[in-house]
Amino acid sequence: MQISRFLHIERRPAGAGATWRAVFYTAILLLLVFCGQSAVADDGWDDWGDTGTASGTSEPKIKRPFISGWWNWQYNEFSSFDQGRVTFEKELGKGSKMVTGGRFNYYTEDNNKKWKVFPGENYYFCKAGDFDFKAGLLVESLGSGDKFSFVDKINSRYFHNGLANDYDRDKKEIPGVRATWYINKHFKFSGHYLPYFTASEFPSIFSKWAYAIHKSLANELLFKGGVYNAANDADFDPQFHVELSSTYPKLEMRWHYLRMKERLPIISQDKPGIFNGSYPLDETFAVDGSVNVTEEFLMRYEFALSRNRTWTTFENGHIGKKFYSDHYGILLGTDRNLPNNFYVNVQGMVSHVPDLLTTTPFQLNETEYLSSLQMRQNFRQEKLQIEFNALKNFTSGEYVLTPKILLVKSDYLTFVFGYQLNGEGAESLGPVGQFSKNNTAVFETRVTF
């Protein structure tokens, strides 16, 4: 969490990371050697970058690297935000490949400018019999929700410009290994091992997208002499996820167990003026998948239980002492292409905290009912698209509306004109309501190559 370099913040010493580094890099080395030996046994890896002969023809088969990427520029009434990614992909044979890439962000708000250049997805993928492996800097997706998910907890996120973020593009790459065992045509077993923890990143407290709890904490430190003991937001602290999947013609089901850390800091005022930050355990049991109700109706679902989660108390702009409670999440959703080029996607969600003592930064009531809706009408062979997106919390009254017009000039260039409307409902400091003054028109340029 970004507060200020001048505030009285004490950081706890990091744990002994040398041992974990040695274990992690040794595991990666052994994985690469194992996959390399498997591939060499099959085809010798003689064709990396060379020409070969396709089966049944005299035409040479050339394996060239593939370069792709995108650049996205968003502009509104008070800020602009550039995001870009370049990816280099090289096929190595027998389904093995190497992917490397880089990303950049450039955020401008009033007179504040912030550059950030960092590695993108960088990983090595290989197959060995009924197994496949993926190791490096990963961006993974779990769950069945399109706009929101109670299961998708592998990656932290970049919250650079608040609610205007794109759900899929703002995931933070994390070092890790993924392994999958294809047991038979119906079942597979997979898992992630993540040796290094990194927390989500937030905007500066001076940003229009700064969260209310962070501004309240800064006020305590600047004007009331408070002390904040911040937890390490990056450290060698192993996390893991295991999954058993089953697939049948009309039913998909995935069972998950996640032993992760909270991606957002838990802030607790344990003594008057003494604030402690932490990233405690987030242990989740979940199931997700889909059911073919009819030939034309597919229902997606998620059910998740997070045991004894830690919650930050935040009521009327004041930070209190943390508390503990289970968390239940339910999601049902479907999408469908209708006649006349009309598309609709709808999700319903329930979030339940049975032992909610008071309001938190992200949950205001013991049980909250939410829904997301996306409708899109295509014209002129999808060159012109009118899209409406909405997220509504029926319990608190908060909502986000983002109508858009998309002008697709080519496969490489798209212009977007839209508006973002944030409704505060009954609670002005709710997760959406605190940004109700940030309603703005939006112009966006998307370039893909």
Language-model segments: what does each one mean?
Residues 65-67, 94-100, 130-133, 186-189, ...:
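Repeated loop/turn-to-beta-strand initiation elements of outer-membrane beta-barrel proteins
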Residues 248-253, 258-260, 290-391:
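Detector for outer-membrane/organellar transmembrane beta-barrel domains
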Residues 96-210, 246-249, 422-426:
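Outer membrane beta-barrel
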Residues 91-94, 127-130, 183-185, 247-250, ...:
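Outer-membrane beta-barrel strand-turn architecture
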Residues 86-90, 121-126, 177-181, 242-246, ...:
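Residues on the lipid-exposed face of transmembrane beta-strands in outer-membrane beta-barrel proteins
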Residues 67-75, 100-104, 135-139, 191-195, ...:
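Transmembrane beta-barrel strands of outer-membrane/channel proteins
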Residues 159, 436-449:
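Outer-membrane beta-barrel "beta-signal"
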Residues 78-84, 115-120, 171-175, 236-240, ...:
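Residues that define the transmembrane beta-barrel architecture of outer-membrane proteins
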